[in-house]
Amino acid sequence: MVASTRMGEHGVGGSEDDRSKRAFVKALLDDVNALERMLEGELFETGIRRIGAEQEMFLVDDSMSPAPVAPEVLDGLSDDRLTTELARFNLEANLSPRLYGGDCLRAMEDELVEVVGVARQAAAEQGANVLLTGILPTLRKDHLGLDNMTPNPRYLALNNAMAKLRGGAFHVLIRGLDELETTHDNVMLESCNTSFQVHFQVGPKEFARLYNVAQVVTAPVLAAAVNSPLLLGRRLWQETRVALFERSVDARSSAHQARGQRARVSFGDKWIDESVLEIFREDIAQFRVLLGHQFSERPFEDLEAG
């Protein structure tokens, strides 16, 4: 779907022009309407499931402090499975999609071990190492400046748009064994989090049921796999990534929060009744566009052309 591609698009623009933003919203709505036509016409692959994953990782130096050398590490590689993340001390590996069945999980594990090894070898050439951990315990607030943001226009544009929407510094309050209350003037707090993210391709007619199942099992899976008790020197939740993920890019003003406006980043608040269309339509209706994008797609013409 064209709209979902745009949501992760690197070629974004930071235009503040209202006309451009309205045109972008119209393009998103056209994409969603084209998606609806595809669902009604049963134009998606069915009867098959695939699984894939992303692995985010930290780059660290000999003292286990963050090593901001990701661009240099990637410059020495020709492996397109490895790419940047928000911070210069993070990398991301995208594993190959596989048919769901047989030894797919073992094959996924084997590839993960192999690609992390590739990253580790390249990192060593820059005097760094790869570490898989939810939140790096040695992170300090001074590591989270814009000087450690990956030099990609997309990230800076997102940072500026979020800050403008927020209308001030980002405020984080997390209470656990200790308490962390801090403000930050950019979105780099989000770079404290890394994770292993599974992607699961299913048929359109089974999407709603399996999406709801995923929401049900999220809590016990997190309870069985927590590993992020420390953030900026404080002992917080056993899985502090949950709290940090929700708060670090919360662009709502205090007035919007008081009125109960839904956060842009959340873990879901309702079941899906019929299809994925419900998610896209609700997001477009509730959230303002942050960034535009130069586009030339015509989804309905593309559908007609096959």
Walk through the language-model features, giving the residues of each.
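Phosphate/nucleotide-binding catalytic core
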Residues: 1-306
